[in-house]
Amino acid sequence: MELATVNWVAYVVPIAVTTTIIISAMMARRRRRRAERSPCARPPPVAAGAPLVGVLPWLLAKGPLQVIRDAHAELGSVFTVRLLHREVTFLVGPDVSSHFYQGLDSEVSQDEVSRFTIPTFGPGVAFDVDLATRREQIRFFGDAMKPAKLRTYAGLMVREVEEYFTRWGESGMVDLKQELELLVTLVASRCLFGEEVRSKMLREAATHLRELNDGMRLVTILFPHLPIPAHRRRDRARARLGEIFSDMVRSRREAGRPVDDMLQCLIDSRYKDGRATTDTELVGMLLSALFAGQHTSSSTGTWTGARLLARANAEHLRAAVREQERVVGRYGDRVDYEVLQEMETLHRCIKEVLRLHPPAMMLLRHARRSFTVRTREGDEYEVPAGRTIASPLLIHNRLPQVYRDPERYEPGRFCPGRGEDGAGGAFSYTAFGGGRHACVGEAFAYMQIKVIWSHLLRNFEMEMVSPFPETDWNVVMPGPKGKVMLRYKRRNMSPTVKITNPHTRYVC
């Protein structure tokens, strides 16, 4: 027995010693690497702030855009801002944004930072459900936004827009912001719900959607149920819209008559386990689609008018009008999906508006695991697990290293051969997000705005009466502040109009 023990010890001890040496060497190497990296992979610098409340006093005094701009100018492309009980690390620019947009949901999550939307969209959808269910619901929307469906929606949009503007006289003055809020609600509801609800939806839905947007304020991100007037109006509006949409869903199911619109697509959708969508889910999905689409298109449509009709941008307005003359000369009064795809100048005009006036102030994520980012200057920062991270679109899309003269409205920057957004690399243009969570409604939004402005440019001479609008920074999805008054005079862009060179393109 003693001999066996000695033999066992003689066999095991060398292995144990060798293993210990190897593990010690590996740990020492890891410590050396960590020590070598520690001077670079340090925590992001923190913006100056008051005790306990952080940057809140500066936020109230300067507004969110200026606070973020100041911190970016002082601290660079990676910095942290303290706001009450929360620390937010901002990642500015394509060099440090890859993980934000491409990271796995297990590493970079939307859930923890987006639950403030639940009072707006309601139960059973979006961030009230688990990731697997939300992915399937996004798939339902994606199926409803495929090119074949967009071709159908284009015809519906054109008819609604043409009918709406018959209400305008030969000349007059209107609040463009209010007009487009109503029109976009009408157009979106036609594509979403069908013709039978069109008149019922118009003014009441537009009012309630405005109350929903007004109820999604900056304070909502931190305190979504704070008993303030804006939240009370939001809750009442959500309840009323829920009633309207529930009636629509019930009526459609009872009719049993298939209709070619988004509601029918969502009713016909099935989860992977074969389950159909419930009425509660349908109401929430319809509301979220209408809310997002109505705000993005009406706000962007208004900004498009404000930019194109500004005196400094007369050249871009002329280019957009000339393009409509070419299209009319080629196709007459026909406007459909294919014709809209040829409106490249108008598309660039809208894209540039979205660069300067994105639908959201910033995008948020929650870091479930720590990660390291490297700036274009070569500095490394480690973002810790548990941190809220933000991509500030208002700064991100105006970087001088990506866009030449970034504060200037210049649609030509997106022309072929110039393509500043492409030259800047991935995630240089993020008006509709990007990566794993790019907006599925981007093509729908562009098409809707193009239909509206194609009609306006063809049929009206326009002049902006109001000063260039300020931005309403009080809400999460900022838009033009106040009235945007426009004077118009009807004109006829005849298909027989003489075009000097029908193949002339906007000079980039």
Predicted features by range, described:
Residues 391-420, 501-504:
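Conserved cytochrome P450 K-helix/beta-meander segment immediately N-terminal to the heme-binding cysteine loop
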Residues 2-5, 479-508:
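C-terminal helix/juxtamembrane-tail motif
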Residues 55-76, 243, 247, 326, ...:
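Conserved cytochrome P450 K-helix E-x-x-R motif and the immediately C-terminal K′/meander segment
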Residues 109-118, 151-302, 319-322:
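Cytochrome P450 heme-thiolate monooxygenase catalytic core
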Residues 313-316, 442-479, 483:
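Cytochrome P450 heme-binding "Cys pocket" and the immediately downstream C-terminal segment
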Residues 143, 416-449, 472-475, 480:
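Cytochrome P450 heme-thiolate "Cys pocket" and heme-binding signature region
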Residues 2-123, 127, 131-136, 151, ...:
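N-terminal membrane-proximal hinge/A-helix region immediately C-terminal to the signal-anchor transmembrane segment
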Residues 296-309, 452:
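Short, small-residue alpha-helix embedded
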